[in-house]
Amino acid sequence: MKSFMVFVLIFACFSCYYAQESTNFYCGRTLSRALAVLCYGAESKRDAGWWIPQHGHHALAGVRGKRGPVDECCEKACSIQELMTYC
């Protein structure tokens, strides 16, 4: 009985690990919704305005030449952990 419980525990650990590491393609509206949910905890409403804070838009001016979430998650699959690095 104990060996069965150890097997179940090990199987559960591996299942959780591989579930976290699964990758998907996120493009367009799916990408923006995923970032909104991951970064802000909920999908923003249309009337709430642009989801980037007013002081944050200047930080995006120097992004040219760097890989962004579209490069990382739309052109190739990425994990939730990779998506969260863009929060």
From Swiss-Prot:
Its main location: secreted. PROSITE patterns: INSULIN. Residues 1-19 form the signal peptide. The keyword Transcription regulation does not apply. GO terms for cellular component: extracellular region. Gene3D superfamilies: Insulin-like. InterPro entries: Insulin-like (IPR016179), Insulin-like_sf (IPR036438), Insulin_CS (IPR022353), Insulin_family (IPR022352). Keywords: Amidation, Cleavage on pair of basic residues, Neuropeptide, Pyrrolidone carboxylic acid, Secreted, Signal. Pfam families: Insulin. The modification Arginine amide is found at residue 64. It is found in: Secreted. GO terms for molecular function: hormone activity. One of its GO terms (biological process) is neuropeptide signaling pathway. Residues 20-44, 68-87 form a propeptide. DAGWWIPQHGHHALAGVR-amide: Expressed in corpora cardiaca (CC), corpora allata (CA), antennal lobe (AL) and gnathal ganglion (GNG) (at protein level). Expression in CC and CA detected in most animals, in AL and GNG in few animals (at protein level). Belongs to the insulin family. This is Insulin-related peptide 1. It comes from Agrotis ipsilon.
